[in-house]
Each structure stands twice: as structure tokens, then as C-alpha cells.
Curated annotation (Swiss-Prot):
GO terms for cellular component: cytosolic large ribosomal subunit. InterPro entries: Ribo_uL30_ferredoxin-like_sf (IPR036919), Ribosomal_uL30_bac-type (IPR005996), Ribosomal_uL30_ferredoxin-like (IPR016082). GO terms for molecular function: structural constituent of ribosome. This is Large ribosomal subunit protein uL30. HAMAP family: Ribosomal_uL30_B (MF_01371_B). Keywords: Ribonucleoprotein, Ribosomal protein. GO terms for biological process: translation. Belongs to the universal ribosomal protein uL30 family. The keyword Manganese does not apply. Part of the 50S ribosomal subunit.
Length: 64
């Protein structure tokens, strides 16, 4: 009866240098601190909103 939580893998492909402070903070909030760093995160509405805010700096893959 329990639903599996959908997961996404995000990889930072763009640099935060020269970006607005909010975008830098969002990357840090996602746990990304350097180029080519990856994290697997639960696909909650909060996480997807953060990803949407910096989508131009990320590569996003859905995991099964």
C-alpha cells in the first residue's frame, strides 16, 4: 500500500559565478557545491521548485 517516492538525480553543469545570490543559495540548498557534482533527491514539490529555479545550471534525470 505504501507508495515509492519518486527520485531525481541532479547534476550541476553550469557555474554559479555571476549569478544572482538567490540562485547560488538554491544550488547550495540542493546540496550542489561544485561543477559536475550530483545528488539524488526525492521529487517533492519543494525540491522540484528549487530545480525549476536553476534549471539552466542543472542536468536532471528521473530515476525509477
Amino acid at each position: 500500500m505504501s507508495e515509492q517516492v519518486k527520485r531525481v538525480r541532479v547534476t550541476q553543469v553550469g557555474s554559479p559565478i555571476g549569478r544572482k545570490p538567490g540562485q547560488k543559495e538554491t544550488l547550495i540548498g540542493l546540496g550542489l557545491h561544485r561543477m559536475n557534482a550530483s545528488r539524488e533527491l526525492a521529487a517533492t514539490p519543494e525540491t522540484l521548485g528549487r530545480i525549476r529555479k536553476v534549471k539552466h545550471l542543472l542536468k536532471v534525470e528521473e530515476l525509477s
